[in-house]
Amino acid sequence: MNFKKLPKIELHCHLDGSLRVDTILDIAKKDNIPLPSYNEKELINYVSIMDDCNSLDEYLNKFFIPNKVMQTKENLKRIAFELLEDVAADNVKYIEVRFAPLLHVEKGLNIEEIIESVLEGIKEAEKLYDIKGNLILGCMRNMDIPSAFEVVKKGAKFIGKGVVAIDLCGGEEPHFPGKYVEVLKLAKEYGYRITIHAGEAGVGENVLEAINLLNAERIGHGIYIKNCAEAYKLVKEKNIPLEVCPTSNLHTKAFESYETHPFMDFLKDDIKITINTDNMTVSNTTITKELEMLNKFCGLSIEDYKTIYLNSVEAAFTTKEAKKRLKKFVE
């Protein structure tokens, strides 16, 4: 089965986890940014999981260097463009890129400039390739609540211009959703769609709270609903799509192998599974690689692929017209 040739959809891809390593080097040299190595083969060890990783927190350390080169409008635009260029080459037809604007203010850019630069890169790629992209704004859970309000308020002017949703991301603590009720209430009033990272690092109850307290329409990862019957039942009853990222889940030690990952059990039980990369560079992966691994180790069939693709179409934060276009690729 040639997954490379099949059309694909990416709903969970972090911009700062998906930079080309040669771009990091190029920008660092241009902007005089210190790196631990200026050799591409050595630098990759600092931005990708090459051998082993013991936790989500250790995984998140790989973002430090990429964010250093994402502090100017020019660089943000370039990096967004290159991401869409790369996924278009993998036959991805639609992508929702997510990033946290407040990680890119070190050199004085404001939130509006940051969002605008990323949107410019996305739109430039759309002109050249057979791909459409939208943007999800992330609020970092290790920042204070006023920071989250700031992202929601300042990003709202871009809703309908490429920004489609809000997300909470970063390290996951038990019962975090309770802190963000007012933030997400405001986001919903502005018209943001809502996806929340939850149930990635062992706490299935967070998925329950993300849906009940924050009105999450999709869940980033969500794999630990397997340990919370109430969350599992709610996800199934409400048809809440899960943005599953298998290789990333292995890297963060959520599971030991593809074979023990619960995605196939979820799929067979009609949970709305979508398959995504999470971070193409950090996890050294593509959507094609994800599908190939699931085919090799879990018996993913062409019928399963089509189910996942159509789940992704329905879950996408895009227009009815765009969804019709995406469905035609597999009809």
UniProtKB/Swiss-Prot annotation:
Cofactor binding note from Swiss-Prot or TrEMBL: Binds 1 zinc ion per subunit.
GO BP term, pick one: purine ribonucleoside monophosphate biosynthetic process
GO cellular component: cytosol
Cysteine disulfide partners in this protein: none
Entry EC no(s): 3.5.4.4
Name assigned to this protein: Adenosine deaminase
Site (Important for catalytic activity): 221
Keyword Zinc included in the entry's annotation: yes
Domain of life: Bacteria
Stated role: Catalyzes the hydrolytic deamination of adenosine and 2-deoxyadenosine.
Family: Belongs to the metallo-dependent hydrolases superfamily. Adenosine and AMP deaminases family. Adenosine deaminase subfamily.
Organism: Clostridium botulinum (strain 657 / Type Ba4)
Broad class of enzyme this protein falls into: hydrolase
